[in-house]
Amino acid sequence: MAKHAPIFPNVQGFLHGGDYNPDQWLAYPDVLEQDVQLMREAKWNVVSLGIFSWVSLEPEEGLFTFEWLDEAIERLTHAGVRILLATPSGARPAWLSAKYPEVLRVGPDGRRNRHGGRHNHCYTSPIYREKVRIINRKLAERYAHHPGVIGWHVSNEYGGECHCPLCQEAFREWLKRKYKTLDALNHAWWTPFWSHTYTDWSQIESPMPHGETSIHGLNLDWKRFVTDQTVDFCRHEIEPLKQVNPNLPVTTNFMGTYPGLNYWRFRDVLDVISWDSYPRWHAHETLVPEAVHTAMVHDLNRSILKKPFLLMESTPSVTNWQAVSKQKRPGVHVLVSLQAVAHGADSVQYFQWRKSRGSYEKFHGAVVDHVGHANTRVFRDVQAVGEMLERLAPMAGAEVKADAAVIFDWENRWALEDAKGPRNIGMHYEETVVNHYAALWRMGVPMDVIDEEQPLDGYKLVVAPMLYMVRPGVAERMKAFVERGGSLVLTYWSGIVDENDLVFLGGFPGPLRELAGVWAEEIDALYDGERVPVRVADGNPLGLAGHYEARELCEVVHLEGAEPIAVYGADYYEGMPAATVHRVGKGKVYYVAARLEDAFLRDFFARVAAEAGVARAIERELPDGVSAMVRSGDGVEYVMLMNFTPEAREVALDEAEYKPLYGEAPTDGAVRLPAYGVSVLERPARNG
């Protein structure tokens, strides 16, 4: 398997750097000179430059002052530091708000915002779009062919929504294109409920707390519109950049699993995916809960374009906006940086280079503290990451080959979380996906994280927790996948509604019923603290043994061709299936009918993955809290072992021939990882 081409032409190895804001320090020329030398010491080779610099670039309408940016780019380029040049739309100048108040966002309460904050602008506003086009064009004409500029960092952390008259009209036009007629819209939204039928397009407004929120189809389409409008704004930003230099890659930085935007919709406008990672490290006894969730989001971002991504932001130490600003313990910064690389990142980048003297983020972590020199623990941690990335440079571009995929779907999440019932104190969609992902993560199984519309070719195992919404074509793709020999895991509360959030008629799980071989008659919601015992079925096909517990949600299902794996041990559904398997063609469909404890998921997925022939990073059991990942390319595989606990762990290796590259080396067929320790090993590719 060949490696991917470099993300940025003529840039080999990993990128190491982060946000750099020289415009905050123009009155301190000695600081700007020190920055370059300190970057060399920190082993930085890239900066994101100019992210919030609009007023420094255009202090008055039509007056452009690029001289400070010219100097910064020349100084960085001379030092060998490459530049991801930002477009500054994330925070507009006060003169723009004052002269053109229509660019200011209107909140869901119907009130127009004042100037302030950031991303407080309307994506629909023609004036704002024109002003963004002008500044982006100016930047492109001046810098798009500069040898030090390797790509565009478009805006920053898109998010939010606007309810102004311009957006209301744009939403209505979006709906007209989608539904063509009001009759079609009224049927799709089921508006006769509570006499909410629309008789004129002008009656439709965005969901607002003091207005309409009870039509779930409206709520769902509004979220789709907000995503489409944001993607269109992003495309509008990119156009003048690509007109000047079509070969310069573009990206924008995502925010984890931010609920406001469906990030899959950006895949057609971006050349590379990047995201900002800020877990609450040390919030639990071990780092494992945060490590699992972070790993899943890394995999999601890699899966969007199926190639390496950029870790655009992380903190070398702390944030200042979380409830507790907990410092990373010694060794943790290298550990979590390697985790990003292990899951497919070709960069480790930070916010921010130097701590600001004032305003909102003056206490946010940075490489250079207010003390202003390199003699700090955090600076040394950053140096250590730079040294690691230099040693691992041949790994850049290597593939993460996944036999398994877990479905995390934004539209499914929107609909599921908007539904009233069966458990309004928490359906926990994202947590449920993470729990299923975690069972495979603990086994060292590389995974893609995809939405429900992605092709399933090439996978051996697909896990689809709580697939409440099943859009057209999804059931058919799943059936074809299973018939070819794939293993599919479905759960309770799946196949409930269609793409319009209309309930399927004829029995659940709707279009997945025949495939699953079960009929879900009803679902029982439990109060917090309630538990229902579950026991394995005698002679069950997976060979499971023992007893487990279910919590929160228990479906009452009837077998329609499936075989029981486990059954309920109490309540009115005692003896009925709690987990099943249905053989379809050459494959199998598993249906987990209750929210079962982690112990069940571990035992269940260990057997399901083995039967499906899913490859693991190493073919050995991993100690608790240790993660194993593998990247491959050009005939070799890079295995990364990471200990997310504060105690030492010993990892037994399989029979492959391992060569140490970084961290702990193998001894007598095992690697001993200290607390928060890592090991990177090279072995010949399993398949040549």
Curated annotation (Swiss-Prot):
It comes from the Bacteria. GO terms for cellular component: beta-galactosidase complex. Gene3D superfamilies: 3.40.50.880, Glycosidases, Golgi alpha-mannosidase II. CDD domains: A4_beta-galactosidase_middle_domain. It catalyses: Hydrolysis of terminal non-reducing beta-D-galactose residues in beta-D-galactosides. The gene is bglY. Optimum temperature is 70 degrees Celsius. Retains 90% of activity when heated at 70 degrees Celsius for 30 minutes. Approximately 48% of lactose in milk is hydrolyzed following treatment with enzyme at 65 degrees Celsius over 60 minutes. This is Beta-galactosidase BglY. It comes from Alicyclobacillus acidocaldarius subsp. acidocaldarius (strain ATCC 27009 / DSM 446 / BCRC 14685 / JCM 5260 / KCTC 1825 / NBRC 15652 / NCIMB 11725 / NRRL B-14509 / 104-IA) (Bacillus acidocaldarius).
